[in-house]
Amino acid sequence: MRNKFIEAFEAKQIEGKKIPEFRPGDTVRVAVEIKEGDKKRIQNFEGVVIAIKGQGAGKTFTVRKIGANNIGIERIFPLYSESIAGIEVVRKGKVRRAKLYYLRGKTGKKARIKERRD
């Protein structure tokens, strides 16, 4: 059981954020705001959501993409982070698991996810 004051604080943190609904298996494009000195720029990270963890303001999601030379790159993003400029769902995937860690061992066509039609 969580403290009601902590829940109220977290609800206030979450309040103003517009976040689309996505699930594991979906391909998302996350726009990350990067500060370099006094300049800011936005960098996109596109990949498959392989896990969603936590609840409230501490909720995180893991995105995996295949980079150069077929090297898998995974990033864990806090869902309500100030550094996330936006999240866009590119494609909805049809999977039967909540955690898709098995994709780490798959390459090429074996790592494909069917599209969800709904």
UniProtKB/Swiss-Prot annotation:
Query: Which BP terms does GO give this entry?
Result: translation
| Function summary | This protein is located at the 30S-50S ribosomal subunit interface and may play a role in the structure and function of the aminoacyl-tRNA binding site.
Keywords, A to Z, come to: Ribonucleoprotein, Ribosomal protein
Database matches in Pfam families? Ribosomal_L19
Q: Which InterPro entries match?
A: Ribosomal_bL19, Ribosomal_bL19_CS, Ribosomal_bL19_sf, Translation_prot_SH3-like_sf
Q: Does the keyword Ribosomal protein apply?
A: yes
Q: Provide GO CC annotations from the record.
A: cytosolic large ribosomal subunit
The record's annotation in Gene3D superfamilies points to: 2.30.30.790
Q: What is this protein called?
A: Large ribosomal subunit protein bL19
